Swiss-Prot record:
It comes from the Bacteria. The keyword Transferase applies. Its EC number is 2.1.1.222, 2.1.1.64. HAMAP family: UbiG. The gene is ubiG. InterPro entries: SAM-dependent_MTases_sf, UbiG_MeTrfase. Keywords: Methyltransferase, S-adenosyl-L-methionine, Transferase, Ubiquinone biosynthesis. Belongs to the methyltransferase superfamily. UbiG/COQ3 family. GO terms for molecular function: 2-polyprenyl-6-hydroxyphenol methylase activity; 3-demethylubiquinol 3-O-methyltransferase activity; polyprenyldihydroxybenzoate methyltransferase activity. This is Ubiquinone biosynthesis O-methyltransferase. SUPFAM superfamilies: S-adenosyl-L-methionine-dependent methyltransferases. O-methyltransferase that catalyzes the 2 O-methylation steps in the ubiquinone biosynthetic pathway.
């Protein structure tokens, strides 16, 4: 048997997958390791739904869906949702939670590049939240997301800027001081400057529509979307019409 890896198998970081597999059983614990994701999800969902003109009746792909927090919430909005992830345990948790909640989401274990090879231009909306900084080749993910969306469709990315403030806030602050996420969750070398992400987007048929920052105030313990992309940020793009 040929032992060579497939052309897209390189874009999997098994150490990153192992991090999330280890805590997958607590994905839906509102006070556990994924508490920040639960808290920012209404902001993410609201941004995606508003800028997509609503999600009802739309075919949506959630890339790097993990345990299904965003995927389920989009399905509750009336979307037909597919969730992609390479972690077996997070997907098992996602499937069980969807079953218990009476929510229909199709969860698939494969890379976004593999999915794009089989489902090009099939989705109205593609989301890729907090995933780009966990893969070896984020540009490949951007390209695959662009290939999956229909003409005129929406693609959303979120990630973390790469600078001193982002390291201080997302690594030192979130992991070691406030202990909002487990130590070792983030690697500052994998953070992505907005100019880099926009450069990759410009090489596809996607066009930037809007960019916003996701901000946390430790004094009020509140998250909000607002201008300023020096730490966490979200990008909305659209695919050109034929």
């Amino acid at each position: 048997m040929n032992a060579e890896k497939s052309p897209v198998a390189h874009n999997v970081d098994h150490a990153e997958i192992a991090k999330f597999e280890a805590v997958a059983s607590r994905w839906w614990d509102l006070d556990g390791e994924f508490k920040p994701l639960h808290r920012i999800n209404p902001l993410r969902l609201g941004y995606i739904a508003e800028r997509s003109g609503g999600l009802f009746g739309k075919k949506v792909l959630d890339v790097g869906c993990g345990g299904g927090i965003l995927a389920e919430s989009m399905a509750r909005e009336g979307a037909t949702v597919t969730g992609l992830d390479m972690g077996f345990e997070p997907l098992q948790v996602a499937r069980l939670h969807a079953l218990e909640s009476g929510i229909q989401v199709d969860y698939v274990q494969e890379t976004v590049e593999e999915h794009a090879a089989k489902h090009a231009h099939q989705y109205d909306v593609v989301t890729c939240m907090e995933m780009l900084e966990h893969v070896p080749d984020p540009q490949s993910v951007v390209n695959a997301c662009a290939a999956l969306v229909k003409p005129g469709g929406q693609v959303f990315f979120s990630t973390i800027n790469r600078n001193g403030k982002a390291w201080l806030m997302a690594v030192v602050g979130a992991e070691y001081v406030l202990r909002m996420v487990p130590k070792g969750t983030h690697d500052v070398k994998k953070f992505i400057k907005p100019a880099e992400l926009l450069g990759w987007v410009d090489l596809t048929w996607l066009k930037e529509q809007h960019i916003t920052g996701l901000h946390y105030n430790p004094l009020t313990d509140k998250f909000k979307l607002a201008p300023g992309v020096d730490v966490n940020y979200m990008l909305h793009t659209t695919a050109k019409n034929d």
